[in-house]
Amino acid sequence: ILVKLIVHKNKAVYHYQSVRNTQTDFPVLTCAAAKRADGAYRFIIGARPGRAVLFEASAETIQALVEEKQKAETKADADTRENKDKAQIEKKAVCLATWVRDQVQTSSNMRGSAEYRKHLTGVLIKRAVRVLEDR
């Protein structure tokens, strides 16, 4: 008999998305994302077929990914602060999307091919990071 259940609350913001062929169809791919107070991200990719998989990126990992991308780009812009903030968010979104997309294992079925699901993974991660950074 279950007597007590304790759920610890974590300060975080959350976002969920799914891609479906039709509104009432099973999803082709789902993405749940969380940004914790310490700057770390958690992404859960589901409906891929197989069990949902978790990807965690600490703030240090994210910073390393962004710095690696910045080294590849040697362009120096004199933008406004707002544009720089948006550019930083976009770089973070692209880096995290690439990082998760390269790791996720997908397969094909009647709802979508493995390549399509990999592409959707990147798109959904980018969207999630943009939304979570704006909150």
Q: What are these model-predicted stretches?
A:
Residues I1-R135:
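C-terminal structural segment of proteins
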